[in-house]
């Protein structure tokens, strides 16, 4: 099994960590969840804008028009799907968790699971494509994806467990979203394995960079602010950027990058 596929599997499996936290009652503080989301956004922004997009543009034979065009397609594609596909957000469950409406909570959790699955699927593809092009960047993307999968698993499993009383059901529904990400990675492994053209991989990587930027600014940062409105998510973003940037420098210095 290839390393990029393993990274994708591990990133998707992080959803189960949140699911177990949701059913065991050991919920992390809102401040910690918000910081982790900001941290993940910082990693994604730095890698997308400072590494993935420049690497795609520097590929031999890649024109700036195609490179930036694919980046914009990734941006607009994410925003378009996010607006067209009705889905709930994790904060919806956080707000409804205190309401004595178990059936309503369960329905919302199921809708949330389906919505998260829809955007986790391309994340699995993005993780695999990035790791296939540059293993160093793949580690960073996998870490960022895993960090924001944990609160997603928690947001689904906790309310479902409260509504049904079944830990197995709660973990099942939370795990579906993680499995969607793994499925995306597996399909990318099966389909993209035959696409050996560097230009094709560079174009896909530019589009993935656009998706990651959109995900960071439209999903992760606003969600971090809603979970913990008393603290600025920018601290987590800056911390994620700084640590990721430092790690990239260290890896390149020792010859791994």
From Swiss-Prot:
Transmembrane region(s): 5-25, 33-53, 61-81, 109-129, 137-157, 171-191, 195-215, 236-256
Residues bound to Fe(2+): 120, 123, 149, 152, 181
InterPro entries xrefs: ZIP, Zn_transptr_ZupT
UniProt subcellular location: Cell inner membrane
Cited PANTHER family: ZINC TRANSPORTER ZUPT, ZINC/IRON TRANSPORTER
Function of the protein: Mediates zinc uptake. May also transport other divalent cations.
Name this protein carries in UniProt: Zinc transporter ZupT
Species annotation: Salmonella paratyphi A (strain AKU_12601)
Gene this protein is translated from: zupT
